[in-house]
Amino acid sequence: MQKMFRADIVLVSFLLLVAGAGASHALTAEQNTAVRFLKTGMEQLKVVEYQAARDSFEQALRYDDSSAAAHLGLGIASFHLHDDSYAERQLMRAAELNPRDATPYQVLGELYYRKDDLESAASFWEKAVALAPDAADLRSRLERIRKEHRTEKDFNRDVTSHFLVKYEGREKIEAGRIILRILEDAYGEVGRGLSYYPDRELQVILYSGRQFQEVTDAPGWSGGIYDGKIRIPIGGIEQETPGLRKLLYHEYTHAVVRSITPRCPTWLNEGLAQYFEGHEIDSRQKVALNRIAQAGKLPALSDLEGSFMGLGNSQAMYAYLFSLSSVRYMVDSFGMYRVKTLLEELGKGADTGKGISNGIMISYEEFERGWKRSLE
């Protein structure tokens, strides 16, 4: 399953900073020009046009190098473009210019977290929490990173050209190698299916069942999660099993989808993950879907766009079934090429409705009606 997370969690506070730019005093002509570029960059960030946003913030700084908001925006855009050293310089400069703002430290924490430097990430988030003590999300994030660091600080590592796996104890070396082999297979197969191969190393962390629950707070029905890293509870893995292969393909698909777009409705994300793991809808499930469709009780797909994390066992079972059913209908009716186009449209900032209309060339409503009719 995918755990909902946002690498652009700082955007709201950044928008407030931009809105207040220059509001407290009269601006020079150059500062006014800088604010115009600043607001353009803000709009480009909102629609995930990171390179264009970076260019706009750099233009703003040519007119006003003392703008904390422009340095912050440039740091955020560069963070998303994975230009980490440049992002860090801009974020540190933003913190110097506006020492009461927690946002630069928040993004720096995300940057070091992505680099797997958990100790440095925690240090930056501690600074952010000190500046924004009422930010519950920040405090929660800091507590989780502390749990991760305590749990993983002595883990072993193994790598391939595409993956880094972390695990505790030499007895899990073979388990790590089995998992890496399966993930390399997934890299090829899912890549061929979606015509997309991520070019950045993906981390995979293997936990005991207790460690998994402590670090992730995942629901009991979850066999693994993807939250920027693949996290899996494992027992004594000694050989590949069909269940392990399905689980790894499922979570790896989430990583691929996330790499294409940070904005994917959960029904589409979970449906694709089940599709690529090879999950089939069995005869009992087909009967259940038909019965629900005949009764007119299939949910609106818009109701399945948010996280499934808070669902109970039965609710989650049906949410996943509806997700797989709708995605299989989409692939069978329009082809995987159109599904990939839909994901790319979402990656450009389109909402689900616009993404579907641009991707598969019919409206969200028409797609949903077609899916529901196919089950009757």
Q: Model-predicted segments: where are they?
A:
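Juxtacatalytic substrate-recognition/specificity segment
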Residues: 154-265, 276-285, 291-298, 302-311, ...
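Pan-zinc metallopeptidase signature
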Residues: 302-376
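Conserved structural position within tetratricopeptide repeats
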Residues: 58-62, 92-96, 127-130
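Structural signature of tandem alpha-helical TPR/SEL1-like repeats
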Residues: 46-56, 80-93, 114-124
